């Protein structure tokens, strides 16, 4: 096999950049929704929040507390959907709030709990696409009072139930055909909506992907370690990584590699320094990229006991709820085809609601945001 002439790194960057410009935006992308319903003895009506995220940016939020309800679009590109679209979405998400209230009561019955405590229902669902628009993965998870309740497995055909109460829900969902409805949505309208939202966003703002960053620790002989600061999956390619000690840049002591294409339209880079063992916390890595709202400062963090994946998700969702209650923003799926199929979506929504509401208290346990999605029917029924 003949070896060709090596391609310069700068040329690889130019080729990758030109390829990325033909896409909606380089890298993988996600559309995620979160629902939260909270009941407390001190409030007459449960607090209900629905939030939608495109990648890591919130674009829509619904907040219902008592008799008041607010619906906020928080990204300029969302307005391209038109007033009729969002009026319909407001109606849907308002209806979902009632389903959550009913499910909070149903869960009290399932677990034989009193009305005097505080209880929370959460749902998170969404989908992700890769560089070329193919579905990467989809998911749906439900939780009650913190722990997992039921979660859709990776095959999108079966559920994992956490306890006997969740087993009842799983059985009724399977009998009602709900599993197939969710899989169809996640593989179709969710992905289609994600791609359309990305295209709308591209029309109103320059495409940037902020770097995913972390610091790794590599022991060396004679009491030294190498600290390597990584920046991954960022776009465009221009980025600056520096190491500092006590606020002073270590220009001469930093090993810096050339920015490299990652193969999916994004880029990667790292910078490393050799430091004395035990002095790692004195060194900071600084990352500058136009996709970041402000420069990042990182240190090497000693490893801690890792949590199981779903526990991590629960912790993240819990943190998002607190942020939502305190500052009006919560954290991180769905969307719909281009074209005039709004009526079809509304019909599908009504059909699924009727199909799944087997019990008056049957619909929606969740923190899976549906705000702003005509393609998604009602919130997933937690119990039925």
From Swiss-Prot:
Domain spans labelled Ig-like C1-type: 211-299
Record localization: Membrane
Record has Transport as a keyword: no
Major site of localization recorded for this protein: membrane
Segments traversing the membrane: 315-334
Keyword Mitochondrion found: no
Keywords associated with the record: Disulfide bond, Glycoprotein, Immunity, Membrane, MHC I, Signal, Transmembrane, Transmembrane helix
Annotated region described as Alpha-3, given as residue ranges: 209-300
Region (Connecting peptide): 301-314
GO CC entries: lumenal side of endoplasmic reticulum membrane; MHC class I protein complex; phagocytic vesicle membrane
Topological domains annotated Cytoplasmic: 335-384
Tissue: TL antigens are only expressed on thymocytes, activated T-lymphocytes and on some thymic leukemias.
Glycosylation sites per record: 63, 112, 116, 309
Purpose of the protein: Involved in the presentation of foreign antigens to the immune system.
Family of this protein: Belongs to the MHC class I family.
Name recorded for this polypeptide: H-2 class I histocompatibility antigen, TLA(B) alpha chain
Gene for this chain: H2-T3
